[in-house]
């Protein structure tokens, strides 16, 4: 074997190694991207858990307010003030009921979003590890 043969062989091996290293670097980059996305979705899921806790706390407060509104704690003598009180109390009950329904809808939406975020986090984590 002369020097040119050795040089040619080394250069071809170097090209193979370089190509292989580039493929590995690309794979690492892709998997790192998946891990970043998985981490972002996990963080989103975590934050949505706190939002759900806040909504549940608010729902309990609204439920307490609705229960309190159903109790007649004020007695007014005379028809006119009593009628006004009843109308305002009924309006408050109606608004609290609407607020409760909105809270329930928001709670469902947040729960679905949290589930989807968890699924996406798992999906990207699995992509990164496979």
Curated annotation (Swiss-Prot):
Could you say what a knockout of this gene produces?
A: Deletion mutants display only a small defect in acute infection, but remarkably are unable to promote persistent abscesses during animal infection.
Taken from the UniProt entry, a GO cellular component term is:
extracellular region
Signal peptide coordinates: none
Tell me the superkingdom of the source.
Bacteria
Cellular localization per UniProt:
Secreted
Segments passing through the bilayer? none
Keyword list, A-Z? Secreted, Virulence
Q: Provide the induction entry.
A: Negatively regulated by EsaB.
Function, as annotated, reads:
Required for persistent infection.
Can you state the subunit structure given in the record? Forms both homodimers and heterodimers with EsxA. Homodimerization is calcium-dependent.
Q: Which family does it belong to?
A: Belongs to the EsxC family.
User: What is the protein's name according to its record?
Assistant: Type VII secretion system extracellular protein C
């Amino acid at each position: 074997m002369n020097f040119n043969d050795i040089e040619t062989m080394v250069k071809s091996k170097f090209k193979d190694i370089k190509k292989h290293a580039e493929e590995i670097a690309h794979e690492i980059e892709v998997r790192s991207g998946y891990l970043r996305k998985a981490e972002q979705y996990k963080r989103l899921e975590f934050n949505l858990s706190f939002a759900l806790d806040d909504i549940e706390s608010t729902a309990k407060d609204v439920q307490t307010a609705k229960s309190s509104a159903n109790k007649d704690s004020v007695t007014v003598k005379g028809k006119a003030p009593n009628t006004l009180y009843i109308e305002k109390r009924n309006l408050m009950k109606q608004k609290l009921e609407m607020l409760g329904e909105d809270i329930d809808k928001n709670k469902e939406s947040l729960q679905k979003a949290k589930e989807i975020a968890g699924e996406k986090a798992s999906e990207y984590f699995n992509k990164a590890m496979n």
